[in-house]
Amino acid sequence: MSHPIYELPIDVNQIQTLIPHRYPFLLIDRVIELDLEAKRIVGQKNVTINEPFFQGHFPTRPVMPGVLIIEALAQAGGVMTQLGLGRDALSKLFYMVKVDNARFNKQVVPGDVLILEVQMKRLIRNMGCYYGEAKVNGEIVASAEVMCAGARE
């Protein structure tokens, strides 16, 4: 199957045409690598002190919640799925239905650039299975296997 060529980086405006997430829950700022043949994507999230979750997690020592790092990986997988399958985000929603083997190795704090490396393992009907690693400065800070299911609006 021949895939269209996308000019990189894919910015946040283009990302918003592919997945339905919006501020404050859009957790991928750009796509910096994309290989649809290999079913691999690399996204980026610039973590700033202005993130709403830092107000309560934790006020005197802000740390990005691990579940949001996993969500960011799932969103990167969703972008890849939309680009690879040519689906319109308005007609198809993907819900995270399972997380396995989640590991959190290091805290993510304001000022970090979170790199989201996601590999699609399989796509069966409306179910996508992904493996993702989140990195800061080349070091794995979190990883997980994620399953997402598609559903009509």
Swiss-Prot record:
CDD domains per record: FabZ
Record-annotated active site: 57
Family annotation (SUPFAM superfamilies): Thioesterase/thiol ester dehydrase-isomerase (SSF54637)
Pfam families to which the protein is assigned, alphabetical: FabA
Signal peptide interval: none
EC numbers on record: 4.2.1.59
Gene3D superfamilies: Hotdog Thioesterase
Entry keyword set: Cytoplasm, Lipid A biosynthesis, Lipid biosynthesis, Lipid metabolism, Lyase
Subcellular location: Cytoplasm
GO biological process: fatty acid biosynthetic process; lipid A biosynthetic process
GO molecular function: (3R)-hydroxyacyl-[acyl-carrier-protein] dehydratase activity
Class in the EC hierarchy, top level: lyase
HAMAP family registered for this protein in UniProt: FabZ
Biological role: Involved in unsaturated fatty acids biosynthesis. Catalyzes the dehydration of short chain beta-hydroxyacyl-ACPs and long chain saturated and unsaturated beta-hydroxyacyl-ACPs.
Protein name per Swiss-Prot or TrEMBL: 3-hydroxyacyl-[acyl-carrier-protein] dehydratase FabZ
